[in-house]
C-alpha cells in the first residue's frame, strides 16, 4: 500500500450510485497517490510544510476490470490547479490542484469527450499530446483545431455553393420575366417581328390577288395561239408566255411536245365547238339582218 504524498493531500471516500462520475471543481491544493486501488486515510491537515505539486492520474481504459483499478501519481511541480473528483464503483476520489490539460487527457482517454468550457489556445504541450495518443485504447480522433478548421472550410464552401445557386436562379428569373410569351410559351422579339411582317405581306398579297381576280373577271381570257375564249375550253393552261395563256388543247400540245398544234388540222375541233357558240352566232346573224333592213329603209326614204 502506497502512502499519500504531501501533507496537504487528502482523499474523501463516500458511497455513490453511479459507476463512474467525474467532477471538476475549484478548490485548494491537494494531492494523492494510490497504486493498488485501496484507500489510505492517513492525511495530515495541520502540517503546512508538505508538498503541493500537481497530480497526473492514469485511469485504465477498461473500467469493468475490478482487479486493474490502479492509479499513479506523478509530481509535475507547484502549479495552481483545480479540484478533480472521481467516483468509481461506490468510491469517490478527490484530487486537488489538477491542471486542465490532465483532465482533458483523462477525458479523451476514457471516451473522447471534451471539456465543457472553452479551453485556452495553448491547451496541452506536444509532449503530453504524444503521450496521450500513444496510450492503448485511445480513440483515433482529429484534434480540436483541425476539426474546427475543417468545419469552417465546409461551411464556407457550402455558403459559396448556395450563393452561386441563388445568383443563378435570380438571373434566370429576371431573364424569364423580361422575355415575351405567347400562350405561356417563350417567344423572341425577332419571331414576333417576322410574324407581323409576314402577316402584313400576306394581307397585301391577298388584297392584290383579290384586285387581280376582280379585274380578270371583267376581262375574258382567250388562247394566244388559237384565240378560243376561256369559256369555250375546259381549262386554261400554261404556255411560253406564262400561266393561263393557252387553251386546253394548245396547252397540252405545248406541255407534251414543246410545240404548238397545227390550226389547219383543227377543223373538227372547231366543228365540235360550234354547238357551244350556236346561240351567239344566231344573235350575230339577227343583228346583221336588222342592220341591213335599217340601211335599206334609209336609202328608200331618200
Swiss-Prot record:
SUPFAM superfamilies named among the record's database cross-references: Glucocorticoid receptor-like (DNA-binding domain)
**Residue ranges covered by zinc fingers (GATA-type):** 217-273
Q: Which Gene3D superfamilies does the record cross-reference, listed alphabetically? A: Erythroid Transcription Factor GATA-1, subunit A
Places the protein is found: Nucleus
Q: Name one GO biological process term.
A: regulation of DNA-templated transcription
Q: Which residues form the CCT domain?
A: 147-189
**What is this protein's tissue specificity according to the annotation?**
Predominantly expressed in shoot apices, inflorescences and roots.
Kindly indicate whether the keyword Amino-acid biosynthesis belongs to this entry: no
Keywords, A to Z, come to: Activator, DNA-binding, Metal-binding, Nucleus, Transcription, Transcription regulation, Zinc, Zinc-finger
Q: What PROSITE patterns does this protein map onto? A: CCT (PS51017), GATA_ZN_FINGER_1 (PS00344), GATA_ZN_FINGER_2 (PS50114), TIFY (PS51320)
Q: Name one Pfam family in it.
A: CCT
Q: Where is the signal peptide?
A: none
Which parts of this chain are annotated as the region Disordered? 47-66, 119-141
Give the protein name, as stated in the record: GATA transcription factor 28
Amino acid at each position: 500500500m502506497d502512502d499519500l504524498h504531501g501533507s496537504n493531500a487528502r482523499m474523501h471516500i463516500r458511497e455513490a450510485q453511479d459507476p463512474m462520475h467525474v467532477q471538476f471543481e475549484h478548490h485548494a491544493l491537494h494531492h494523492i497517490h494510490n497504486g493498488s486501488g485501496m484507500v489510505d486515510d492517513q492525511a495530515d491537515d495541520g502540517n503546512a510544510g508538505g508538498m503541493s505539486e500537481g497530480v497526473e492520474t492514469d485511469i485504465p481504459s477498461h473500467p469493468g476490470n475490478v482487479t486493474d483499478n490502479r492509479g499513479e501519481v506523478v509530481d509535475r511541480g507547484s502549479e495552481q490547479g483545480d479540484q478533480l473528483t472521481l467516483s468509481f464503483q461506490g468510491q469517490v476520489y478527490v484530487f486537488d490542484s489538477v491542471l486542465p490539460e490532465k483532465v482533458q487527457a483523462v477525458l479523451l482517454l476514457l471516451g473522447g469527450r471534451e471539456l465543457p468550457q472553452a479551453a485556452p489556445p495553448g491547451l496541452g504541450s506536444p509532449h503530453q499530446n504524444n503521450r496521450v495518443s500513444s496510450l492503448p485504447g485511445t480513440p483515433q480522433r482529429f484534434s480540436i483545431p483541425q476539426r474546427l478548421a475543417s468545419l469552417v472550410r465546409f461551411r464556407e464552401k457550402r455558403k459559396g455553393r448556395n450563393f452561386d445557386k441563388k445568383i443563378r436562379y435570380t438571373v434566370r428569373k429576371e431573364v424569364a420575366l423580361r422575355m415575351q410569351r405567347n400562350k405561356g410559351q417563350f417567344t423572341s422579339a425577332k419571331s414576333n417581328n417576322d410574324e407581323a411582317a409576314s402577316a402584313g405581306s400576306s394581307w397585301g398579297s391577298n388584297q392584290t390577288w383579290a384586285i387581280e381576280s376582280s379585274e380578270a373577271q371583267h376581262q375574258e381570257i382567250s388562247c394566244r395561239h388559237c384565240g378560243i375564249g376561256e369559256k369555250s375550253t375546259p381549262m386554261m393552261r400554261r404556255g411560253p408566255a406564262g400561266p393561263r395563256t393557252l387553251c386546253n388543247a394548245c396547252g397540252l400540245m405545248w406541255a407534251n411536245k414543246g410545240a404548238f398544234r397545227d390550226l389547219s388540222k383543227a377543223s373538227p375541233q372547231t366543228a365540235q365547238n360550234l354547238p357551244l357558240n350556236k346561240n351567239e352566232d344566231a344573235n350575230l346573224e339577227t343583228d346583221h339582218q336588222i342592220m341591213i333592213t335599217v340601211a335599206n329603209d334609209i336609202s328608200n326614204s331618200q
